[in-house]
Design a protein with these regions (language model features):
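Non-catalytic C-terminal accessory region of glycerolipid acyltransferases
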Residues: 2, 27, 52, 65-193
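Catalytic core of membrane glycerolipid acyltransferases/transacylases, capturing the structured
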Residues: 6-65, 92-101
Length: 193
């Protein structure tokens, strides 16, 4: 599918070993680039260390604030990309665009992955990790849509939320429960049209 569309978007939850994307180049065709979107750390030494760790197997780090620009540049250079985004974190209050019920809680989701998918018209996959034993996981790529521009606003993000909820209900211990998922309340956020 990367060959056909020039790229794909991978929606990745904080589930099991979510850092698997850093080694994804080993399962991609030569020349395809696994792109990892990340939020730079305030401590420049820790940031440099994490970037070094996450790129040692051929991954390409892109800072969250320059995602669209970097992906467009890679595509203009005729690079095929698999853009991996961990999308179940709580966004900043001014980035709180999509609210839904998730695990029986009013929950805001980041919608940056959906925006990138629509901008580039890249197919979108939900990445489900299944623990196979100590130190082993299997990743299943479930197609959400091959035509993101044809979807309604919020449809891709909602689909991600529903699939993640199913994954968590099936095996709750592997979700990263400690990342303050419900710290934002609707009344504390800027509402967008």
């Amino acid at each position: 599918m990367i060959e056909k569309h020039g790229g794909i978007v991978l929606l990745i939850p904080h589930y099991a070993n979510f850092e698997w994307i850093t080694g994804m180049s080993s399962i991609m065709q030569e020349g395809d680039i696994p792109v990892q979107i990340y939020k730079p750390l305030h401590n420049k030494y820790m940031d440099a260390m994490f970037k070094r760790i996450r790129t040692r197997f051929g991954g390409y780090n892109v800072a969250k604030h320059s995602t669209a620009r970097e992906i467009i540049k890679l595509c203009r250079d005729n690079k095929r990309v698999a853009v991996g985004m961990i999308t179940d974190q709580s966004p900043n209050p001014n980035e709180a665009h999509y609210w839904t019920t998730f695990l029986n809680q009013d929950t805001v989701f980041m919608d940056g992955a959906e925006r990138i998918a629509k901008l580039m018209d890249f197919p979108v996959f939900y990445c489900e990790l299944q623990k196979q034993g100590r130190g082993y996981c299997r990743v299943r790529f479930d197609l959400i849509t091959e035509t993101p521009k044809a979807t309604a606003d919020g449809e891709i993000t909602e689909c991600f939320a529903r699939r993640l909820e199913q994954t968590i209900r099936r095996e709750p211990p592997y979700w990263f429960w400690s990342h303050k998922r419900w710290k934002l309340k609707r009344e504390d956020t800027i509402q967008h049209g």
